[in-house]
Design a protein with these regions (language model features):
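Residues immediately within or flanking Cys/His clusters that coordinate Zn2+
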Residues: 87, 213, 314
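Surface-exposed interaction/gating patches
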Residues: 203, 209, 278-330
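Beta-strand-dominated extracellular/periplasmic modules and repeats
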Residues: 55-56, 61-71, 79, 83-96
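Gly/Gly-Pro-rich "capping" loops immediately C-terminal to redox-active cysteine motifs
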Residues: 78, 82, 91-127, 143, ...
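Methionine-biased hydrophobic packing positions in alpha-helices, especially
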Residues: 137-138
Length: 403
């Protein structure tokens, strides 16, 4: 990208010498006003925590349950336990009799009727398990309004009927024996992986003049040489903005200050350019370090945010990718946080679209019923900063594919 009135700088150096890189620092790098992607849920969960705001109701203590529950309907309870539309269903995390692709994040409930748990205990554990375990992964189903009190009584009645260990006709239905299947696609084949086509678009944009009459190539003529390690050292802390910038936000702000192009984060142009630049670093070893007090503070905040409970379902990043890592939520395998970011942006087959790290973070929030933040949110930046360091030593593998 052109640097008007200054010596030509190789962009790979800018992550280390950020004050030398022209940046527009005042405007939002995200579309304004930010609105959720058109094909995502339109629901508003403003009564629950986001990565920025506190709104979720506090733990209310034990609920009163007098004697055995006699008005619960076990058939209704079973239907609720299997209903994916009501928060993912109990099957997302637990084995139940007759289940298809149950998860194993939580304990096997197929014999819970033999455990000797009282109705009071079962009711309160479903209503808000935090009264027993503050750090539980179990969503506060009643306290957060997913299920009514009557529905929870029905679910208790159903659980009390479960006294026989579950059996599976297909080994793939048993999460404790299920194997991860190898992908049927080849991400390195441009005919199979549409991300290569987006990288080609990024290459064209790299040589396309912006409103100021210059292109990225005007100053960075040898892209393959200049960018062979750049992506492996992003994100970086930008002292002029006192925040972390990743590749996509850097592209937005550097282009505005040089070529005059306005490639907003999550636009096709921005993602295509980011994909192209990362392909030039394909095979480079990721190496993000925290040396200054500011860098260490931002990384520490990212680590802290990964433990933050958000949304109506009250999940944290580390619930799924720490405590439950290498287990199954229904048919989805939960990978650990380590070595997760080297392939972004990637083509997500289930969505037929290119996904950046920020879109992935937004999606995780919406999946647990938390309102997402704009893609240039400093909270996401800190999380990506810390997460990328967990991939240190692995290699950039953009463009990739995933389901």
């Amino acid at each position: 990208m052109a640097i008007a009135g200054a010596a030509v700088l190789a962009l790979p150096l800018l992550a280390d010498a950020s004050p030398k890189a022209p940046l527009e620092t005042q405007k939002s790098a995200a579309p304004e006003p930010w609105t959720r992607y058109g094909n995502w849920s339109k629901a508003n969960w403003d009564k629950f925590n986001t990565m920025r705001t506190d709104a979720s109701p506090p733990v209310a203590g034990f609920q009163r349950v007098y004697g055995p529950i006699t008005d619960g309907d076990p058939e209704k309870g079973k239907k609720l336990a299997f209903d994916r539309g009501r928060g993912g269903s109990c099957l997302a995390c637990h084995i139940l009799p007759g289940a298809t692709l149950p998860g194993n994040v939580g304990p096997d409930l197929s014999t819970i009727g033999n455990w000797g748990r009282t109705d009071w205990w079962l009711y309160n554990y479903i209503y808000d398990a935090r009264v027993f375990n503050e750090g539980t992964m179990m969503p506060p189903w009643g306290r957060h309004g997913v299920y009514t009190e009557a529905e929870i009584r029905d679910m208790v009645a159903y659980l009390k009927t479960l006294k026989t260990p579950a059996t599976f006709k297909d080994v793939r239905d048993d999460p404790n024996a299920r194997k991860r299947e190898a992908p049927i696609y080849n991400p390195d084949d441009p005919f199979e992986n549409p991300a290569w086509g987006e990288a080609e678009l990024g290459e064209k944009l790299y040589s396309t003049a912006g409103p100021n009459g210059k292109s990225c190539a005007s100053c960075h003529q040898n892209a393959k040489q200049d960018f062979k390690t750049w992506a492996a050292r992003m994100p970086y802390y930008e002292p002029r903005m006192k925040k972390v910038l990743n590749g996509e936000e850097f592209i937005t702000r550097h282009a505005r200050a040089t070529t005059g192009a306005d490639y907003r984060m999550q636009s096709r142009e921005n993602t295509a350019l980011a994909t192209y630049l990362r392909t030039l670093a394909r095979g480079a070893v990721i190496n993000v370090r925290f040396n200054t007090p500011e860098e260490k503070a931002r990384a520490a905040n990212g680590r802290k945010l990964m433990d933050r409970k958000v949304g109506q379902l009250n999940f944290a990043c580390n619930d799924c990718h720490g405590q439950a890592a290498n287990k199954w939520i229904r048919g989805q395998y939960l990978g650990p946080s380590k070595n997760q970011l080297g392939h972004h942006p990637y083509y997500r087959t289930s969505q037929s679209d290119m996904w950046t790290v920020r879109k992935r973070l937004q999606w995780c929030g919406v999946a647990v019923r938390a309102n997402e933040l704009p893609p240039d949110a400093p909270e996401y930046a800190d999380i990506e900063y810390y997460l990328t360091s967990l991939s240190n030593g692995s290699k950039v593998s953009t463009p990739a594919m995933g389901h």
